[in-house]
Design a protein with these regions (language model features):
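Conserved short loop/turn motifs at secondary-structure junctions
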Residues: 28-32, 60-68, 91-100, 123-124, ...
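Active-site cores that bind ATP or allylic diphosphates and position pyrophosphate for catalysis
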Residues: 63-65, 71, 108-270, 328, ...
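Long, charged, mostly alpha-helical binding arms that flank functional sites
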Residues: 250-327
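Secondary-structure transition/capping motifs at alpha-helix termini
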Residues: 16-19, 48-56, 82-89, 217, ...
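A glycine-rich helix N-cap at a beta->alpha junction
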Residues: 73-100, 105-106, 113-116
Length: 552
């Protein structure tokens, strides 16, 4: 549930004053790309506030720009909201559903002398408006056309008599305003492109700043909450509402975007990464997209926990991605069952163990006491095992507590073994490690009371499965990608080690039944999930630990 913040304070005041009786919010993404972690903040705010106040939450696909939108993105957005558990109880709508009403309201403004058809080009219009708020503006030569002439031209625009850019419908507001958005903004433009829902019915389309408040009002939205870059657009939002509907609601309010380290949120950049083949699609586990995070192994709970901890304010800030990692790590530590995986295997042969024998040890699925999981599983033990290469050293460094020549170590959940010899390949690399097991230590400590400090994991060579394990890291080396030097190429900051593929890994055989969406802790290694696209591949969700301390 949403915490108290400045947005809920506004809503509380509106309810207390009797201005509204039911809260109605919406999430209005443009279907021209995939949702990302920043989108999750907007979803969470609108969905959770509606939930908190027993109100309604709409999903509206803002498909008013036919050139960039498509069903692929529409379907992905709906799927992402469902996955997050933020299903819109108020319904799913499309901006294009309101094209007829938008057109009628545009004609209303024209008839009232509040809108006019302009012949200036985009560049001329910008120059006449003053280019920026610090320069004076001057009226278009076409500003004083009569309502009758404007209505005729607007209808001819709709009929397809003019080329793109030849005519534009502008609101007649205030050319002297210090707010550029009120200097007679464009509210309709000509665009010859097939719409994914409307086909070729329309060749004129409403601008976002005109369509958005109309859509909000028609749907009964009470609080139109959007990101901070729309704050200067609020006076125009209010102008549209007042001049078309004559009401005080909907009310637009703004919050700061969610910016995260070591990634980019720009749809243009993300699309470029996909189209150039730098990443494996929009759902590449390194991407900040929700489908990418899902494939990586993140959960809806961890994402919404991260958004809530990041806070809701009007101040821009940069959130360390390690805070997101901390959220999923805390969750999986309690929920993920433990399994054994050897990523860089070397053969360990227990010489005093029968070749034809297979023994099964009961191993805890989750030894974390807070998980309250008392279940166990059977893990096969045989004469030949696989252990991690790094868990053996012929010449150990100081404080090395794993297996050494002549040294002892505990095989996790099984016997204590002592290394007796090593077989080597012609190039000097280790082919196999030989050891003997203290066969009296399968269920406890040595009878003579000797202490064995090291414990390593292992899998049976005869009862394991082969897999590829992908170790994912941050996509960019630069923490603040919004602050890279002007003119530099963001791709120069790509992390060359953002994914390391480990092949020939040996995994506990119980993982043969694992499905995409399942989460596991590979003991001593990290948290992993089966890849949804490639059978036999596991993706690292997050490492076991990190020095980062999340904000409280």
């Amino acid at each position: 549930m949403a915490d108290k913040n400045f947005l809920t304070d506004i809503i509380d005041a509106d309810l207390a004053e009797g201005k509204i009786r039911e809260i109605h919010t919406r999430f209005p993404p443009e279907p021209n790309g995939y949702l990302h972690i920043g989108s999750a903040k907007a979803i969470y705010i609108n969905w959770s506030i509606a939930n908190q106040y027993g109100g309604k939450f709409n999903l509206r696909l803002d498909d008013t720009n036919p050139a960039r939108e498509g069903e692929e993105y529409v379907n992905s957005i709906i799927e992402d909201l469902h996955w997050l558990g933020a299903d819109p109880n108020g319904g799913i709508f499309y901006g294009s559903d309101y094209f007829d009403q938008c057109y009628e309201y545009a004609e209303k403004l024209i008839k009232e002398g509040k809108a006019y058809v302009d012949d200036l080009s985009r560049e001329e219009m910008r120059e006449y408006r003053g280019a920026d708020a610090g320069k004076p503006s001057r009226p278009s030569p076409y500003r004083d056309r009569t309502p009758e002439e404007n209505l005729d031209l607007f209808r001819r625009m709709r009929a397809g008599e003019f080329k793109e850019g030849e005519k534009t419908l502008r609101a007649k507001i205030d050319l002297a305003s210090p707010n550029m958005n009120l200097r007679d903004p464009a509210i309709y433009r000509i665009k010859y492109a097939e719409h994914h829902r409307q086909g070729n019915k329309w060749c004129i389309y409403p601008m976002y700043d005109f369509a958005h408040p109309i859509q909000d009002a028609i749907e009964g939205i009470t609080h139109s909450m959007c990101s901070l870059e729309f704050e200067n657009h609020r006076p125009l939002y209010n102008w549209v509402i007042e001049n078309i509907f004559g009401t005080a609601f909907p009310k637009q309010r703004e919050f700061a975007r969610l910016n995260m380290t070591n990634t980019v949120m720009s749809k243009r950049y993300l699309r470029e990464l996909v189209e150039m083949g730098i990443v494996d699609g929009w759902d590449d586990p390194r991407m900040p997209t929700l489908c990418g995070l899902r494939r990586r192994g993140y959960t809806p709970t961890s994402i919404f926990t991260f958004v809530r901890e990041a806070g809701i304010s009007k101040s821009d800030n940069l959130i360390d991605m390690r805070q997101l990692e901390a959220c999923i790590r805390s969750e999986l530590d309690l929920t993920a069952q433990r399994r054994i995986a050897v990523l860089d295997p070397v053969k360990l042969i227990v010489d005093n163990y029968p070749e034809d024998k297979t023994e099964y040890f009961d191993v805890a699925n989750n030894p974390n006491r807070e998980a309250n999981d008392t279940t166990t599983r059977k893990v096969a033990f045989t004469r030949e095992l696989w252990i991690e290469n790094e868990d053996f050293a012929e010449v150990p460094p100081p404080k090395f507590k794993r297996l050494t020549l002549g040294g002892e170590v505990r095989l996790m959940g099984a016997y204590i073994v002592k290394c007796t010899s090593v077989d080597k390949n012609p190039d000097g690399s280790i082919a196999a490690i030989h050891c003997t097991a203290d066969l009296e230590t399968g269920n406890g400590n040595p009878a003579d009371g000797r202490k064995v400090k090291g414990t390593i994991h292992w899998v049976s060579a005869a009862r394991c499965i082969d897999a590829e394990v992908r170790l994912y890291d941050k996509l960019f080396t630069e923490a603040n990608m919004n602050a890279i030097p002007e003119g530099s190429d963001y791709k120069d900051y790509l992390n060359p080690e953002s994914v390391v593929a480990c092949t020939g890994c040996k995994l506990e055989e119980s993982l043969k039944d694992a499905k995409p969406g399942d989460k596991f802790q590979f003991v001593r290694t990290g948290f992993f999930t089966p890849d949804s696209k490639n059978p036999g591949v596991y993706n690292r969700v997050v490492t076991l630990r990190d020095s980062f301390k999340p904000a409280k």
